[in-house]
Structure formats: structure tokens, C-alpha cells
């Protein structure tokens, strides 16, 4: 599938699509991103054998086409001024949300892998970056879910996590200061998120590590899959997957919550890959609404 615009002369677009066909690509459809300056009156319904889809909002048009056709990839043949940086990222976010790569002349976005690994329902708590309150929200959710009989297990990944996934029975261990000092003396990260989750939520937790973080939240290396396998052996009824920074746990989640600090720059939420995280979200929780981090007016905005 391709994304085109009306800023290009139709013969140029048609020639580009013909060249793709000669190279062995099958173009199922073209989505018009906007622009009518160089289109004939009444628009264009097709370029050769490639039908053109258009509508009021190209994001909706693209989404409908992706769901219907399930292409292998989306190739962006548009350009400024029809697609500026923000609008292009919005279209890329739609494609990634549908699990389809989005690429252009000198870039390619690939949807982060999130396979189904858990034996129980999963809740992901992800954020727009570091210090957003993900661990506090995960602990809060775990406490309340545990109080209502759901027997949650929290899996937290971090840049300082253990080499092998570690189980901490927060429901059994006191985790007093001497316990934390013992962890530190043993060379372990006693302030890791999974330790904090176990101490504050009093539920079993699994600590994992990850390295690297992509624009869409993918991770380069992690032992989260092994951590989920460890969690599958516990008598839990729900697995909470806690993100790290802006990185997303590389595991399928049945429900996803996005933690957004009130003081976040608008561009981090509406631009770049912020729209992708918003598409993943079943709910959004705004944190740090008080001064000096935020304000009531900023939170409402």
C-alpha cells in the first residue's frame, strides 16, 4: 500500500507505481494524504490499476484500508507540505498500531514485537518517558487488584534489571531495610522497580532487564520472555507488565494503560510516536498534576 498526495503531478505518481510493479511489488491501494493543487477537477480514482482511497481524515482512510487489505507494508510517497513531520508520524502510528511497517525514501518504522506469552490476562502500564509514575501506578493497581481477589503478579523491566529474571515474593517477604541491604551486599539492584513493586504492593514480582529503546517503544535486548515464563509458573490470576522509560514490554497486553505526566511537552504526546502510544491505550492516567510539575489548568488541557 502507498501513501500519495495531490502535490505531485498524477503522471509522476503513476510512473512511480509502474516502477514499483516492474520491481515485483504488488500495490493493493493508494491512500491520498491530501493536497489537490495538481489533481484534475473531481480528483483521481485510480493510477493505472491501483485504486485511490480518499476521505476527510487520511488517518481514518489509512486505518480502514489496513484493516481491510492487510498489506505487508506501507510506502510513503508523499512529502512536504502535505505531510509535515507530525502528520507523517501520525500515519506511521496508525500503521504500527495495526502491526504493519511504515517506510519512506530514507526511513522505516517497524512495529515492536509483542507476542502472546502469558498464560493469564495481561495489563501493561507504559509511559511517555522516564519519571512519569509507572511504578507507582503499577503498585497501586496491584494492591487494589489483589484486594479484589485477582492475585496479580507484577513483571518490571529496567535498564538496571538482573541478568536472569528474579522472583521476589512480596506477599511472603517482609522487605525491611536489612533485607534491602542484603540484596545490595549481594551485588543486586536493591532499588530496582520490581523490588519497589514487591515492597509497596505486597504481591509477587519478577524483575527483568532491557537495553535500548526505539521511537515506538521497542527494545533491543531483554529477558522479558524468560520473565513471563517464570511468572507463568506462579499461582497468579493476572500479569501486570510494567514498562521502562518510554520502552514498552515486548509482550502482548490485553489491556494497556499509558501514564502521562501533566507537565509533558505537547509535542511528546501529539508528535513523534506519542500518537502510537495513545492508540495502544485503553486508558490514560495523568500524574504529577500538582505544582511544580503541573497545574489544574495544564491537567485539563
Predicted regions and their residues:
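Flexible phosphate-sensing "switch/lid" loops adjacent to ATP/NTP-binding sites
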Residues: 1-88, 93-94, 114-124, 143-301
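N-terminal pre-Walker A segment at the start of P-loop NTPase domains
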Residues: 96-107
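Short loop/turn elements that flank and shape the SAM/SAH-binding pocket of Class I
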Residues: 110
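Residues at the beta-strand->loop junction immediately N-terminal to the Walker
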Residues: 126-128
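Conserved glycine(s) of the Walker
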Residues: 132-133
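Hydrophobic positions on the alpha1 helix immediately C-terminal to the Walker A/P-loop
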Residues: 136-137
Amino acid at each position: 500500500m502507498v501513501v500519495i498526495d495531490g502535490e505531485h503531478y498524477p503522471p509522476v505518481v503513476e510512473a512511480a507505481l509502474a516502477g514499483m510493479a516492474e520491481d515485483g511489488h504488488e500495490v493493493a491501494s493508494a491512500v491520498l494524504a491530501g493536497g489537490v493543487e495538481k489533481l484534475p477537477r473531481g480528483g483521481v480514482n485510480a493510477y493505472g490499476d491501483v485504486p485511490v482511497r480518499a476521505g476527510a481524515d487520511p488517518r481514518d482512510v489509512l486505518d480502514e484500508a489496513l484493516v481491510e487489505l492487510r498489506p505487508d507494508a506501507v510506502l510513503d510517497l508523499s512529502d512536504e507540505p502535505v505531510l509535515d513531520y507530525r502528520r507523517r508520524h501520525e500515519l506511521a502510528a496508525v500503521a504500527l498500531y495495526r502491526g504493519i511497517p511504515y517506510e519512506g525514501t530514507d526511513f522505516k518504522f517497524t512495529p515492536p514485537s509483542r507476542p502472546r506469552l502469558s498464560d493469564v490476562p495481561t495489563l501493561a502500564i507504559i509511559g511517555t518517558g522516564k519519571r512519569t509514575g509507572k511504578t507507582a501506578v503499577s503498585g497501586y493497581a496491584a494492591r487494589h487488584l489483589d484486594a479484589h481477589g485477582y492475585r496479580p503478579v507484577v513483571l518490571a523491566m529496567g535498564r538496571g534489571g538482573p541478568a536472569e529474571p528474579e522472583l521476589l515474593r512480596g506477599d511472603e517477604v517482609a522487605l525491611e531495610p536489612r533485607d534491602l541491604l542484603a540484596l545490595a551486599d549481594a551485588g543486586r539492584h536493591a532499588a530496582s522497580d520490581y523490588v519497589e513493586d514487591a515492597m509497596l504492593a505486597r504481591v509477587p514480582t519478577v524483575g527483568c532487564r532491557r537495553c535500548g529503546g526505539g521511537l515506538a517503544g521497542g527494545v533491543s535486548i531483554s529477558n522479558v520472555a524468560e520473565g513471563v515464563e517464570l511468572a507463568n509458573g506462579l499461582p497468579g490470576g493476572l500479569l501486570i507488565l510494567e514498562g521502562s522509560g518510554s520502552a514498552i514490554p515486548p509482550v502482548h497486553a490485553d489491556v494497556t494503560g499509558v501514564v502521562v505526566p501533566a507537565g509533558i511537552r505537547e509535542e511528546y504526546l501529539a508528535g513523534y510516536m506519542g500518537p502510537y502510544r495513545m492508540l495502544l491505550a485503553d486508558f490514560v492516567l495523568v500524574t504529577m498534576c500538582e505544582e511544580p510539575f503541573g497545574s489544574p489548568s495544564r491537567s485539563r488541557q
